[in-house]
Amino acid sequence: MGIIVKIFFLFLLTLDTEARPISYSGGHTVMHFNDNMKESIYYHYSPSFKYSVGVEKFDDKIFDRSDTNLRFTYLVNRKNTKNSQRNFYFQSAVSTKNKNYIYGVHGDWETRRYFIGFDYKEVKNIIDYKNKHIQLGFAPYLGTYGDLHTWLMLKTKKNSLRKKQITYPVIKFFKGNVLLELGYDKKTDWDIHL
């Protein structure tokens, strides 16, 4: 592995890189996504626990082009209880190269044992389309702080361009501030979130 790649991964590990739409006040997050629609690297800064601003560099696999988006995410509602947490976000992005933009909502509810999440986005592009997914999961064991945590999940995605709904298994690992999510479907290939 080249020295540049090693330095890049070392840089990622030294940041607070837990995959989340908004970090704590003053926090930074770096995420990498790869699926059948796009591959991207995304960085955001959270001046407040209520919102984040960021930049996403991506390769659009459908329209075979690269672009950079400026992103904004706002925490509309959060509810913490003794046993669970619920989040609801507004998300948006605008292209730095053209008039393309994205807006949508993202939400989740989880306990230490169960997880439910959803995402809905409208994409204004060369051809406008909608992305949506639902994710359900459970933790096969309960770890304590600092342990490696594992989630077994099912993800269902539908995209208005492809007009087919696909459902596939996902496994999610996280420890400390690092998260890795892997899913696979033979029709869409790998779905990776780091």
Predicted regions and their residues:
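A short secondary-structure junction signal
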Residues: 118-119, 129-131
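Feature captures outer-membrane beta-barrel proteins of Gram-negative bacteria and organelles
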Residues: 38-48, 66-80, 101-113, 130-144, ...
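Long amphipathic alpha-helical segments with strong coiled-coil/leucine-zipper propensity
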Residues: 61-95
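Transmembrane beta-strand segments that form the barrel wall of outer-membrane beta-barrel proteins
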Residues: 22-34, 51-60, 85-96, 114-124, ...
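Short, charged/polar "capping" segments at the starts of alpha-helices
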Residues: 161-163
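N-terminal alpha-helical scaffold/docking segments in eukaryotic complex subunits
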Residues: 20-25, 34-40, 44-46
